[in-house]
């Protein structure tokens, strides 16, 4: 058995609810809710509003368009000129071929890319060579003059 101290802590309330439960279930079911009297003017206004809010109704499309795209109502004009131009033919792969022409090349990857041939080194002109000899001779003369 359960001691009286355990029942005082909240078990007593549970026992009381369990004892009263059969009495509550013997009652009659709740009556159905009464329908509100309909006003024909209010009903037709509500129906018009609901018809206007349906997405499939043609009468709601102009109102929706004005809400979604307000710039067109204020003389927005054609928006195509604001879009970026198409970038046809600008896609170049890593080996300087158009992307739709990749299958027609023999080297299919970037690591096989060949750099353009370099120009052969130009022959040095006579002027820098003469200046180099002159500087070398001047240094040799200055070393000899210091040694003397």
From Swiss-Prot:
**Which residue intervals make up region (Disordered)?**
54-83, 105-127
Q: One GO CC term of this entry? A: extracellular region
Q: Name one GO biological process term.
A: vasodilation
Write down the InterPro entries for this protein, in alphabetical order.
Natr_peptide (IPR000663)
UniProt GO MF annotations: hormone activity; toxin activity
Annotated signal peptide: 1-27
The annotated regions of Basic and acidic residues compositional bias extend over 63-83
Query: Which SMART domains does this UniProt record tie to the protein?
Result: NAT_PEP (SM00183)
* Positions of disulphide bridges: 94-110
Q: Which residues form a coiled coil?
A: none
Q: Where does the entry say this protein is expressed, by tissue?
A: Expressed by the venom gland.
The places in or outside the cell where this protein is found are: Secreted
Going by the UniProt record, its keywords in alphabetical order are: Disulfide bond, Hypotensive agent, Secreted, Signal, Toxin, Vasoactive, Vasodilator
Chief localization: secreted
Residue ranges the record assigns to the propeptide:
28-83, 130-148
Claim: Secreted is one of the keywords in the record: yes
Membership in a protein family: Belongs to the natriuretic peptide family.
What the protein does comes down to: Natriuretic peptide that dose-dependently induces the rapid relaxation of rat aortic strips phenylephrine-precontracted. Acts by stimulating cGMP production in a dose-dependent manner (by probably activating NPR1 and/or NPR2). May also show potent hypotensive effects.
State the name under which the record lists this protein. Answer: Natriuretic peptide BF131
Q: Which organism is it from?
A: Bungarus flaviceps flaviceps
